[in-house]
């Protein structure tokens, strides 16, 4: 038998592919078979070439088997030549088509058996050699480390800490991979299971799995679809991923798919690739769907004990039977075990007894998984302070799968529940400790000066569903929270049916598309204090019934579309005398004039990704008369903001944040008018070239952030007059030096800067000994693209 390289020297696969392409284009009766053969041979061709050019010496057995494969391909080549020699309408085409079918079966059998055996054999061969090399390397490294006395080091790996839970995850991965490797011709696979069962965790682990990434040559895309998908964004991501110029098998993982319609729409964009759909429903063929298994009793016991006792089993004096009863009632659901375990942490046995009794009154185990989860979750909430519980329920007003700005969340709670910001912050920590929300990691979270800028929280879908479920138990007109669970083109029909009677809701949340005058119907909301308007469009007519919401204290208008929306109907603001907080995102801000209705109680304004145009340029009137009580102004990612002249006429300002505004060149000289200003953030304003000397006349200023102001090269000479200044953040600035007056900053306690600037501050530290100089690590992120 000739060697493998000799057999394939003529590259028979390339010749055969050309002939098959001609057959597919010219002989109708053989078209389908030829196309299938083309696919099969193209898939195996890279492997053949890899072996051919690797220089490896194959065993006699492997050469014999590959010789058989060569003979099959040679038969196929000769058959193609016969087919092409026949006239177009020759009856022999039928005979040739049957012959091609036989060859197709032979090739398929060979690829499904022999090739896999060869790979396994070579892997075993390499593994033996690799193990020997690894042992030799270990010995050499040990000898080297001993001679140099290297200190012991530790690497932290983000993984599941409990081996039993990790085993469950590995089992799920194994079963999904078995499906993928078995049904190679299938384009749709599924992971299905009840809420909180670990579907997403399993999907994420699969996306990182070496075997999966090897199968798809690292071409794996993970997308979260959600109940109200943004198809424009999702389809854009899919297009960029699939049409990257690389023609190979690819995997798209669609997580949190709610409906068949959503899947069908996205699948129409993923033709020719493999899709793994992750859903509460079974959307793929049962043969290619993995149903996530709930935890077994010992695994569930381990997870609950880790959350409640920080160990894998109950402590010896504790009543193990009580723990077992709680585990039994959780029915193996990981999310339920985790939340309930956290709620029971550090609680005495008597408290556990009460929880067990309440759990036993719940519904017995059955197919209705969501209701069981809600029942367990609600038991976990019973131990919360009533106001914290209400704050948890308020989170149902925000869209699913979206990061919630902490500043927005606390503003809602402050105005809704008459608490201060410090208390609202403690509520966030309390809910986070109970695993009822997640604080998105931010290294500066909790800093007393920074406040809540750039800090977000998220909430699991099941927990949000629980909040909606609990809020909707009473009649629609009696609900304290009137919430739309997902985006709809119009308001709910249930609301329209009951519009003749006033609604008692104090929080109203609407999720719609573009709305005009005809889309709204009248609603009487005399008790409403918070209104959240989420929409996606370029034009949006504000609901006329806002004008009757005389108690409204918080108004949030968020456009989730691609470009800023034009709002219509601003005349309704004339009746919002009690409005205290206004949050606008991705909209055109109306121009302020001397005729603008004053908002005398407005304390907070947030403008995010807005077009502000001339809103803050006018000097012909006193802007402080429109906002006489404004204490907190945030302008972020507003790329058309040019001047701030009128802003510094607002003498009541306590906090001013101008961030990511690329066209701001300078601050106005009337800056010193804002005598009560304590926090000044000018983060990432790359064209800002200087700070006016008037900034030194602010007696209450405690915090200054000029980080990423790359054009700023100096501080005012009299900067040392800021006797109340406690903290400066100046990372990624281009300062050439510090004024000598900074030695007089007796209250300064914290400076964040780059390595190059730190030496300047070391000189200041000699006269301000309590000064802490923090050298910042450079951090590049595009998280803001998610907003």
Swiss-Prot record:
Q: Which UniProt keywords apply?
A: ATP-binding, Coiled coil, Hypersensitive response, Leucine-rich repeat, Nucleotide-binding, Plant defense, Repeat
Q: Which PROSITE patterns match?
A: RPW8 (PS51153)
**LRR repeats, residue ranges:** 549-575, 576-599, 650-674, 722-745
Domain remark from Swiss-Prot or TrEMBL: The LRR repeats probably act as specificity determinant of pathogen recognition.
Q: Which family does it belong to?
A: Belongs to the disease resistance NB-LRR family.
Q: Which gene encodes it?
A: ADR1
User: What is the recorded function of this protein according to its Swiss-Prot or TrEMBL entry?
Assistant: Disease resistance (R) protein that mediates resistance against Hyaloperonospora parasitica in a salicylic acid-dependent manner. Also mediates resistance against Erysiphe cichoracearum is both salicylic acid-dependent and partially NPR1-dependent. Resistance proteins guard the plant against pathogens that contain an appropriate avirulence protein via an indirect interaction with this avirulence protein. That triggers a defense system including the hypersensitive response, which restricts the pathogen growth.
Ranges for domain RPW8: 1-149
**GO molecular function, one example?**
ADP binding
Checking Gene3D superfamilies in the record gives: Helical domain of apoptotic protease-activating factors, P-loop containing nucleotide triphosphate hydrolases, Ribonuclease Inhibitor, Winged helix-like DNA-binding domain superfamily/Winged helix DNA-binding domain
Induction section of the entry: Accumulates in leaves 1.5 hours postinfiltration of Pseudomonas syringae.
GO biological process assignments: defense response to bacterium; plant-type hypersensitive response; response to other organism; response to water deprivation
Q: Which residues form the NB-ARC domain?
A: 247-414
What name does the UniProt record give this protein? Disease resistance protein ADR1
Coiled-coil regions listed? 96-112
Q: What InterPro entries does this protein map onto?
A: Apaf_helical, LRR_dom_sf, NB-ARC, P-loop_NTPase, Powdery_mildew-R_dom, WH-like_DNA-bd_sf
**Which superkingdom is the protein from?**
Eukaryota
| Listed Pfam families | NB-ARC, RPW8
Listed binding positions for ATP are 193-200
